[in-house]
A protein has these predicted regions:
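Short, basic/aromatic recognition patches
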Residues: 5-33
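Zn2+-dependent cytidine deaminase-like catalytic core
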Residues: 8-11, 17, 45-149
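Short glycine/serine- and small hydrophobic-enriched flexible loop segments
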Residues: 22-25, 40, 93-96
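Short, Lys/Arg-enriched N-terminal segments with co-localized hydrophobic residues
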Residues: 1-2
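Short beta-strand scaffold segments in enzyme catalytic cores
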Residues: 33-48
Length: 149
C-alpha cells in the first residue's frame, strides 16, 4: 500500500492483525491455521502459530490430520489429543507471563472449508484452554478477526 494521504495509514489493529496473518503461514496444521501476535506498549513481544509440540512430527510432514482420522470434531477432545499446540499457547509460552501482563493478543484463523469467506475465519475464538491461559498470562485485551482493509 502506498500512502497518498495521512488518513490512508493502516490502523494499529489492522497492522498487527496483518502480521498475525503472516504468522499463520508457518502453521503445520492441515485442518486450520491460526496466527497470534502479542503486543505490549506498541511492541511485538511474541508470535505463535498452531502446530505439533516441539520435537513431534507435524501433520504437514505426516501428510494427514490425526483429528480428522479419528473423526474428532472441532472444539472437542483437546485434553485427549496431544498433537497440537494452539497459536495463542505458543505465543504466551514464547513471551512468558511477565511480558504478557497488560498486553493485547491479536488472533486470526484460516479454514479452507469455509468457502464463503475465502477460508478466513471472521471471528476466531480461543478455546476454553487457551482462554484460561490468556487470563492467567495477564493479557488484558483480545483482538480477533481480520484487518478491516
Amino acid at each position: 500500500m502506498i500512502m497518498t494521504q495521512s488518513n490512508d495509514r493502516m490502523s494499529k489493529n489492522d497492522y498487527y492483525l496483518s502480521i498475525a496473518m503472516q504468522v499463520l503461514e508457518r502453521s503445520t496444521c492441515l485442518r486450520r491455521q491460526y496466527g497470534a501476535v502479542i503486543v505490549k506498549a506498541d511492541e511485538i513481544i511474541a508470535t505463535g502459530y498452531n502446530g505439533s509440540p516441539r520435537g513431534m512430527e507435524n501433520c504437514s510432514d505426516r501428510g494427514f490430520c490425526y483429528r480428522n482420522l479419528k473423526n474428532i470434531p472441532s472444539g472437542q477432545g483437546y485434553e485427549d489429543v496431544h498433537c497440537s499446540v494452539h497459536a495463542e499457547q505458543n505465543a504466551i509460552i514464547s513471551a512468558g507471563r511477565s511480558k504478557c501482563i497488560g498486553a493485547t493478543l491479536y488472533l486470526v484463523g484460516y479454514d479452507s472449508s469455509k468457502q464463503e469467506s475465502h477460508g478466513w475465519i471472521k471471528e476466531p475464538a480461543p478455546c476454553s484452554i487457551c482462554m484460561r491461559m490468556i487470563i492467567n498470562a495477564g493479557i488484558s485485551k483480545l483482538i480477533l478477526g481480520l484487518p478491516e482493509e
